[in-house]
């Protein structure tokens, strides 16, 4: 079996010995012939067939390497965070992905735990985002807001999204912004702290505390938009900080096959990857990519 290897050494604050051990352990389980880029082979210290890709030190390193490996290997092993998984899927490969989390949050439903035994191929539903003439794939959510989560000095913190796009990691508190969201004839417009677009999840079922998202899941809607009065993409708040901004009010809109149109004067992010400020369109698409997940016996 030929195994393509994609590694984001910047995920989760950097590549260390602990992460290297995780990667090597997974590769030993796969027990195949490895194919990857020069830089990845050197970082891991492995024997591998090399493919030539232009190094940019940006997300394009992931996208371009996935494209170079697609169709030339049996599986593409992707090591990184949720944003790396999004970038790999955005290349729309035909070859299945095995995604292992070594990032900041590691909550993407496309991820596979590193201690897997048997694997099976699964088709993934995803959020397809159109922004600035580009198309991206997200599995967690599309978020509008002034902060994103990142790792600074080994700690998970919220950083300013605009400055992050300029290569700076600066801890910041959320700013409010004006935005308009359209789903068909339904419109929400105003000043918000965050806007989230996500696929519904069975975990919302029976959880009335989740508000409108609980009913969206119960009725079988594919997705839901949540416009939140305060910025909640934070990880450094104390109880007193939360008390200070409460009450927090959320307005939701459910959707199936409609296109969610967002016009905002704050940063749009795709699974933690900031895209820019402006207009975005989001839709849910089945079978955006195939991934390997732990095998489940039929009940």
Curated annotation (Swiss-Prot):
It holds the Pfam family NAD_kinase. GO terms for biological process: NADP biosynthetic process. GO terms for molecular function: NAD+ kinase activity. It comes from the Archaea. SUPFAM superfamilies: NAD kinase/diacylglycerol kinase-like. Gene3D superfamilies: Probable inorganic polyphosphate/atp-NAD kinase, domain 1 (3.40.50.10330). This is Uncharacterized protein AF_0748. It comes from Archaeoglobus fulgidus (strain ATCC 49558 / DSM 4304 / JCM 9628 / NBRC 100126 / VC-16).
